[in-house]
Amino acid sequence: MEIILIKPVRKLGKIGDILKVADGFGRNYLLPQKLAIRATEPNKELIVKQKHEFEAKDKQIREEVEKINALIKDQQLVFIRQTSNDGKLFGSVTNKEIADKLSENISYNISHSNIILDKQIKSTGIYTVEIRLHAELNAIVTVIVARSESEAQDYLREQKTETSEDLAELA
């Protein structure tokens, strides 16, 4: 299936790109999500005319996302959970919980589908979590999972010590 992107898509292309994709990917994801349109001759002509409008709209969205990125940068989310004696959680910290807490902290709604977890968080410790804000912009948030507030503070002090040691090595 040949499509024209009307929004930037991560690892696929930018606005106005004409691409050949698998039929199922186009039909089931790109078209319903309004990320692309079919690449017919009238649509190709239309995109050439409207490409500047799409790019201006995307630039506006990107500027808004950069403001959100400034709010998210340096955020530390603390989750207090019950654990077994060896630090394993009874359950896990999910991307939805991270999105909810982050949204609460910055007063802006972040969707759980934008939270990228490499693996499930099932034990206490410090984790870095990637947040996809835009096709071309990701933010990093520190997630601290601990049994108590005091343990979370210990993790934070430990992290600051490691950071200052790393900076001292670079100097």
Swiss-Prot record:
One of its GO terms (molecular function) is rRNA binding. One of its GO terms (biological process) is translation. This is Large ribosomal subunit protein bL9. It comes from Rickettsia conorii (strain ATCC VR-613 / Malish 7). One of its GO terms (cellular component) is ribonucleoprotein complex. InterPro entries: Ribosomal_bL9, Ribosomal_bL9/RNase_H1_N, Ribosomal_bL9_bac/chp, Ribosomal_bL9_C, Ribosomal_bL9_C_sf, Ribosomal_bL9_N, Ribosomal_bL9_N_sf. It comes from the Bacteria. Belongs to the bacterial ribosomal protein bL9 family. Binds to the 23S rRNA. PROSITE patterns: RIBOSOMAL_L9. Pfam families: Ribosomal_L9_C, Ribosomal_L9_N. Keywords: Ribonucleoprotein, Ribosomal protein, RNA-binding, rRNA-binding.
